[in-house]
């Protein structure tokens, strides 16, 4: 669509006393973005400082960090001996938030959208803004000697300056609603990130997602255990208390459909799926429904790997 379509959407939403919350991705950009193209053209110039560019080591990447979608976090900068860093796909180079010019450009962009009439944002992968600038090897957790980047990125004790700048210069002046996609903080620090005194209005409760993990790879889950799931939800609710109105979520774009996870195989019927829906809306907090969840959508079945579009699935295959 065109910008005129968005303007019309915002106008009609406000006329109906509704609000538009957009996805906001500020941890990385596209490798087709003019900033990155300028960095490729002149790595030593201004825009080379907008990214993490490092020389290789022993003929390979600067360290052993493994990207979220598989493979190294480092790819060779075209036409250069330098490597650029990416938490996710190689087409998504990470922005250098240590650079005040990057932060200024991001804040200007966020305010542009808020001035246009957007009412708030879901902040994607926001915990990834802070890096350990030493970029040292991590403990290998895979037979190939690599270490999951998720173990090396979270520097939540030092990320506050970045998030406070966004709140102070963008969110507060516009009374914007914000929800953070924050996977790695402890329960004790929830109020630091969400609520009136936190960086965001609220944050997603992923505790019961993480309780099912049993390895460094995305597909390594324990068999579903009701008590573990229940306890994780209760702990998050009790810990949030009156400080944070959590964003409750049972499924999202990174996860299979809820009936396929939380219901015994063959037991996903109208009544059981409706019970999951009741959980979504009756817990204290803000219910977030992923598209299709409102009709109890189930997982699709794909007979061949060619039918999958998911990067992780294809890479693992």
Language model: regions and residue ranges:
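Active-site and adjacent substrate-binding regions of carbohydrate-active enzymes
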Residues: 1-317
């Amino acid at each position: 669509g065109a910008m005129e379509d968005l303007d019309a959407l915002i106008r009609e939403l406000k006329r109906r006393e509704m609000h538009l919350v957009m996805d906001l991705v500020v941890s990385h950009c596209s490798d087709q973005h003019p900033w990155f193209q300028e960095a490729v053209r002149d790595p030593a110039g201004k825009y080379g400082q907008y990214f993490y560019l490092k020389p290789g080591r022993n003929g390979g990447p600067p360290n052993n960090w493994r990207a979220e979608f598989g493979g190294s976090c480092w790819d060779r900068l075209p036409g250069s001996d330098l490597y650029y860093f990416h938490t996710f796909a190689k087409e998504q180079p990470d922005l250098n938030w240590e650079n005040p010019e990057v932060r200024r450009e991001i804040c200007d962009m966020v305010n542009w959208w808020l001035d246009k009439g957007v009412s708030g944002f879901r902040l994607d992968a926001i915990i990834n803004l802070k890096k350990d600038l030493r970029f040292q090897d991590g403990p290998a957790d895979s037979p190939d000697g690599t270490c999951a980047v998720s173990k090396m990125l979270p520097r939540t004790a030092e990320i506050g300056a970045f998030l406070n700048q966004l709140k102070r210069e963008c969110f507060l002046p516009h009374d914007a609603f914000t929800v953070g996609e924050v996977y790695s903080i402890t329960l004790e620090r929830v109020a630091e990130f969400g609520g009136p005194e936190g960086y965001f209005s609220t944050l997603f409760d992923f505790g019961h997602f993480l309780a099912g993990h049993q390895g460094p790879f995305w597909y390594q889950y324990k068999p579903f255990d009701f008590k573990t799931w229940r306890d994780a939800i209760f702990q998050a609710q009790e810990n949030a208390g009156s400080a944070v109105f959590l964003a409750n979520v049972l499924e999202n774009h990174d996860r299979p459909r809820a009936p396929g996870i939380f219901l015994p195989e063959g037991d996903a019927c109208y009544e059981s799926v409706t019970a999951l829906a009741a959980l979504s809306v009756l817990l204290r907090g803000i219910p977030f429904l992923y598209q299709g969840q409102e009709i109890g959508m189930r997982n699709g079945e794909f007979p061949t790997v060619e039918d999958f579009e998911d990067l992780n699935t294809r890479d693992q295959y």
